[in-house]
Amino acid sequence: MNIFVTDPSPTLSARSLPDKHIVKMPLETCQMLSIVCSEKWGHGYGELHRLDGQPYKTEKGAFRKHPCTIWANACLENTWWLLAHGLALANEYQWRYGKIHSCEKTLEEAVSIIPSAPYPYRPKSFTFAGPDEFKYDTSICLLYTSPSPRDATLSRMPSSA
C-alpha cells in the first residue's frame, strides 16, 4: 500500500504514473480512505462500500499503521489530497482504458461523507514509505512522465473545488 506522489497536484501526480499504478492504486486509495472514515480507526465519517455494495472491512484495522494511512488520517487536507488523487487515478484509468474503474463509485461516496477542506488541498508534507536509501532520490520522478497533456480539471470533483 502506497501513495505515489510525483507532483504536488493530485491530478498531475496521477497522470504521470505508469499503467500498472493507474490500475491498482485506486483500490489502495479506497482501502486507506476506509480506515480514515471508520469509527474505530479513523474519524467516524461512515462506511465506504465496494462496487458490490459490501462495506470495506475495517474491523481489524488492516493498514492502519502504514505510514501512508497514518498520513492520510492526520488531517483533512491530507485526506482530501488523497481523495482528489484517487479521483484523478480513476479519471486517468477511464482516459487510458475507456472504461470506469471499479473503485470510482467508492471514491464518489467518500466525497459525500468526508467533511470539506479548503481547496486546493495542500498537505504540509508527504510521507515516504520506502527504503531509506531512496528517501531523497528524486530521479524516479523523471521516469514518470505523462505522454500527453490533458485538461487538469476532474469532472467528478466536488463543486467547491
Report the location of each language-model feature.
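Charge-dense polyanion-binding interfaces
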Residues: W80-I114
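Acidic, Ser/Thr/Gly/Pro-rich intrinsically disordered interaction regions
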Residues: P123-P131, T138
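Ala/Thr-enriched low-complexity intrinsically disordered regions
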Residues: A152-T153
